[in-house]
């Protein structure tokens, strides 16, 4: 669904003085903690006790859909609807809202409604979607906080499809709005839109990125580097869609289904005729961009991508027109009126076969994009397309399910899906969980089980590491991972290097024995899941470490986690959650391409941590000695498994001088300044808490003589927070 005018990333300065340099400008390699600040503040005008899920449940969804359906054919003079129907515009808006999602870190996607903010609102691929959102504004104002922009944009896409004759698979609300861009997202290394510096030598897009070009949702619709090469385009399509967890069948269904509707706009060259994007537009345009320099930006003069024309003879009806046109006719490349490469039919039969979008006396000829021809030229995609052509019902079902997946992929498990149109069928990509068909343990059983766990042969550090391994897979970006489900015991997690598989097998075996013995002993229907037992064991161990330091703490525990099975788990998809760096366990892979401390902060953001919470967490874990392979790296204490502030006291000690270790770029030796003897060993992750100015300021608080009790309580609070991040059933 590409519409891509040329643009750069510069904004109009209006003759004002240059922007003052930030610290990041002065010191580009300085560790940027700004992404954690997002987790420490509320920037929107929303009350502290506002519950969006509760408000959405009060919404009359049918009334909203009725208003949307009326809007579809209520063409506005300031932005007339193609063919008298806004449906294709709203499909593109919804697609481009959701289509930024990538599996690598779970960021992007429809959550937050971040298409409203830079840079996404000004990407060339999103040209004129500002108009779509303005068309929706009266409906958003009418229903207020009962429906978020994030939910409304996806709902508008669904209603658009339904209003043109297709039955969607379902719709779920529950996406809360953000009020700023997500500063944690790495959109790529380029300095200008529609450029690409993200491919390595074998042609693979850099790890973590989704799109192949800066400022585009997926790929260049003209073909790679603007060359009309369908075979090369197919490779880019497959790679980019794979990075949002779409296989060939889903990809083909989405493209074919989406391109069944509407047209692209290229009445003239966008580079010569369009004004600046919203972020660079003058203030009087009030956030609207891409104005036609010749004065007419709408109707038949509309310019978006520079590619011009419809795909089918019935652009506002669901039919087989796209697939039939693509497969049954031959196509040849040509430069369209906007100067971009597109494909024209060789057959006279298709010429002038489509009504004009605005002038009833005119006719247009269907066109195809290079990315469309790719579905015909690539043998695997073609096989799928031919199957769809022979089986229209299969095509429809595949499009319906792929559209549902596209627009809901970042919402997390099924219990977060709200509203009357949520399908009964749970999808494997939702990481579903079984229901608990037993009574949950109470306070008496919790105390009994904690005592039994601590009386076992398992150490404090083993229990802490296991609970952390289970819970820390959580990603707040797409709500995947976490301790619920106990997927730590399943493939692939049980064999991840960071989880020390042999030791993990021992720990889980002991916990499973305790679980079996407890469950078999109960005749009252009370049972405990392994998922709960893993977290309970970690809590008990942290409480023991605090007791070893003289502090009596009790970590709140709410049972209710369940154990998922292989049938609930798409094992390959969980590899995206495997950490290359787990700073909390001081695990660093040798082949990482970014400084370990950057990955530490990135992971902390996915856990929704602040800089202070991260600091307390690291200090506490080091004092406990909960390191990968039980190394002494960063364990600046003579009393491991004791929750103290020794890590900070010794990190800040000026009697220690640090130097890089000879055997690893990630390791350092702490030498006694007087004797030269090695006192400690550490990683970059440890030393960043004394090097970075902000982290050092926090460390100095925790390293004070009166701060140990504060550290213990802050660590316990942060630990408890992480253990419950995926407990959506408690919300």
From Swiss-Prot:
One of its GO terms (cellular component) is cytosol. HAMAP family: Catal_peroxid (MF_01961). This is Catalase-peroxidase 2. Homodimer. Residues 1-10 have a biased composition (Polar residues). There is a cross-link at residues 95-218 (Tryptophyl-tyrosyl-methioninium (Trp-Tyr) (with M-244)). Residues 1-26 are annotated as: Disordered. PROSITE patterns: PEROXIDASE_1 (PS00435), PEROXIDASE_2 (PS00436), PEROXIDASE_4 (PS50873). InterPro entries: Catalase_peroxidase, Haem_peroxidase, Haem_peroxidase_sf, Peroxidases_AS, Peroxidases_heam-ligand_BS. Its EC number is 1.11.1.21. The record marks 92 as: Transition state stabilizer. Keywords: Heme, Hydrogen peroxide, Iron, Metal-binding, Oxidoreductase, Peroxidase. The gene is katG2. Its cofactor is heme b. Belongs to the peroxidase family. Peroxidase/catalase subfamily. Gene3D superfamilies: 1.10.520.10, Peroxidase, domain 2. Pfam families: peroxidase (PF00141). Heme b binds at residue 259. It catalyses: H2O2 + AH2 = A + 2 H2O; 2 H2O2 = O2 + 2 H2O. GO terms for molecular function: catalase activity; heme binding; metal ion binding. NCBIfam families: cat_per_HPI, PRK15061.1. Formation of the three residue Trp-Tyr-Met cross-link is important for the catalase, but not the peroxidase activity of the enzyme. GO terms for biological process: cellular response to hydrogen peroxide; hydrogen peroxide catabolic process. There is a cross-link at residues 218-244 (Tryptophyl-tyrosyl-methioninium (Tyr-Met) (with W-95)). Binds 1 heme b (iron(II)-protoporphyrin IX) group per subunit.
